[in-house]
Amino acid sequence: MKIKLTICIAFVILINLSGCANFKPQFKTKNDTELMNEKKVSHSFYLIGDAGNSANESGALDLLRKQLDKASKNSTVIFLGDNIYPKGLPKKNDKGRVDAINQLKAQTNVVSNFSGETIFIPGNHDWYNGGITGLKRQEEFIEKKIGKNSFLPENGCPIEKVDISKDIVLIIIDSEWYLTNWDKHPGINSDCEIKTRESFFDEYESLIKKARGKTTIVALHHPIFTNGSHGGQYSFKSHLEPLPIIGTIKNILRRTGGVTTVDQQNKRYNDLRKRIITLSQENEKTIFVSGHEHSLQYIVEDNLPQIVSGSGSKSSATRMVGTGLFSYGSVGIARLDINEDGSSDVAFYSSVGNKKVFQTEIFSANKKATVNYPSNFSKFQRSAIYAEKEIKKSNFYTSIWGERYRTYYGVKVEAPIVNLDTLFGGLLPVRKGGGHQSKSLRLKDSRGSEYVMRALRKNAVQYLQAVAFKNQYVKDEFRDTYTEGLLLDVFTGSHPYAPFTIGTLADKIGVFHTNPVLYYVPKQNALGYYNDDFGDELYMIEERASDGHGNQKSFGYSDELISTTDLLKELHKDEDIILDETAYIRARLFDMLIGDWDRHEDQWRWAKFKEQSKTVYRPVPRDRDQAFSIMADGALLGVVTKILPSLRLMQSYGEELKSPKWFNLEPYPLDMALINESVKTVWDKQVQLITTNISEKIIDEAFTFFPKEVSDESVEEIKRKLIGRLQNLQTISDQYFLEINKYGVVKGTNKDDFFEIKRHQNKTTVTAYRIKKGVKSDVFFKKTYSKLATKEIWIYGLDDDDCFEVTGQGTDFIKVRLVGGQNKDTYNVQNGKKVVVYDFKTKENEFVTKRGLRKLTDNYETNVYDYKKLKYNSNLLIPSFGSNPDDGF
């Protein structure tokens, strides 16, 4: 009896500690259900999720139809995933197919006469029948019923943007794409431009920043915030199943263990939500809409509103805790109204009584500029980047952190005052820039050409957020702190006026460039509400490296510029789309000449040219902030940048480049992706071109663009170092050429390719052909590698059906790795010594011989090309082939 009593008491305590969710409507904020919306609605979104458990029109679907009968054409219905229970859409004639079709018809019939748009998004249950192939079956069925683009994202891809209006953007995410185990879906991403989870985050960050100033709805099946069972809130009944006490223990384990990806406690789910939360802070009007939980919820956390409407055919309990403002475990729907004044409201409707149960405002109306600024300004303004107190440091401090270029941040320089209304015929602000440390504003002229104004004072907190705290929003925590001040001081290792010298030098050697000009930008009416964050300081204003500058000589008169991500996609499309490799090598040598170590992929744009039958891309380097930088100045950073491999790129500018390998830490993966065929004579010719055309006279001319107030002995010191490095450029080039030739990387196209690998003693020749009409056709790559220089050659077939033929006699071969990629590949390995073949285990491939070592695995990372796979360790650069220890690394 005593034992039973103890157990019962323990059970009650556990129940009380864990708390219970329920099915009742719960409120923590004012409920405005009786308030009529007198605002003019711009667009309405009808939200219903998890509606796939109903084979007929009842409950929430009936409620939705009644709402749609009154809806305007400026409306969109979003089915928020789990459109079919329990396991997606089976194949024709498979068990469960009829029931699944009936479930879809019940939903599509509701919108058959709807005058607005309808979008279905996938949930986890929609993935449970063949993964990508099952999704495509559902996509095909829905698009036949409703029309094109009614199932998004398409082709099992992760993200899609829909422009609803000029002020409203819809970003659709397939959250199960991120959460699922890719190794169980060998065909995943084969029809997608995004191939990695990190690339997905890059795309989301780009879209969320581009949508600044607009109401941005992010639709994804799995909620970012929830107070339902997937967030660890359970009903009393769940504590009793399968038995009392055991049910409670089960719930505690589920809440703390994160065993499955359906719950937020799961590591991958939590990683997704934390990163999305952090990136979404860059847009002040983001609204999440989700299903997954079979309830109606409204939560506002971290300034981000979350609408949960996942009770389209089921209901489950919720609990009013934390930042929740409303929850109800009832079958129902939600309506989101975006109003013409920029405000937005949400209303929830329950099938119990078919009535509105909660309504509240999400965002208030757009703020209008209330301050009227003067329109007439003087011609010049003297201003400094930092206040005097920010550059005054003790002797002890400077012994630790160095002198840097700190002094010049506090020097008041005379800059022309600019009125944006008249510059370049008049410029209008478009949106904030997306840099990780620069405070920038994008501007547009009357022709649509874009410009950028960037403050010379960098944003330390923004840098911390982007680099050190990707999964946690910290901007507010670091403002006006010692950490922010210290980082601002570290930034003084780069010379604030260095970018103004680059154009003169680059012009002489045919390297494209932007043309920054120093201005003082006062707060003014042209900035509108951007006056809150911009104005009354020094800026550089330059052409944005983008389309619309076809009259610009420094862009080669190209009217079309693309990003690095888009360049790589283009190069994989066809052998007639090529990179001017020589121009890229010249630009990279110029980076090393001026000491610009910050050359990651987003620091480049690519100008497009049509030359005969070829499309040729040439590099346009941008953001030259780190030219001539002395980041390693001072005792502390001088030591740290030598000890920590990740900081070795921050070498202080001097006549010599002590380690080209580590200086090029950031651009190395891109170099390996783009510099494929060029031999040493190409590099040598570019060195000669640079050293011949950049003379001391040209260097003197370049530095006349420094403000006269900072043109002192330090400028002469930089010029002396630049001349010295110019004299050492051949040595620098030779060292880096050897570094990037240690590994050869050959890539095919996303069409049928034939790779001919001929092996000789100490040498290997790789020739790549297109296959046309079943036979070898045009050669698009040919190079002979020497074993003295190259340790390994990696050959990626990419997509479509590729053939690999390995021939040749001898013993002392370069190791060759063949990575087939998607579709059916053929391997004819006549000499298998030091040949490793990687391909999907569950896909059909043909092996003509049994020679060579086969690594057949469905490991996604092993089989899919990603130029960022190349990794550093403390001694050498190595590739990453998944996590298989047998890869030989």
Spans of features found by a protein language model:
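A short C-terminal boundary segment appended to hydrolase-like catalytic domains
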Residues: 302, 324-378
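C-terminal catalytic region of ATP-dependent kinase domains
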Residues: 469, 490-496, 608-783, 787-792, ...
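Active-site neighborhood of phospho(di)ester-bond hydrolases with catalytic His/Asp-centered motifs
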Residues: 47-49, 76-82, 117-124, 217-221, ...
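ATP-dependent phospho-/nucleotidyl transfer catalytic cores
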Residues: 521-596, 609-618, 630-633, 697-709, ...
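Conserved ATP-binding subdomain of kinase catalytic cores across diverse folds
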Residues: 418-562, 620-630, 635-639, 643-655, ...
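Solvent-exposed loop/turn segments connecting transmembrane beta-strands
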Residues: 55, 881-889
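N-terminal active-site segment of His-dependent metallophosphoesterases
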Residues: 20-98
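Extended active-site neighborhood of metal-dependent phosphoesterases/phosphodiesterases
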Residues: 24-29, 89-216, 230-259, 263, ...
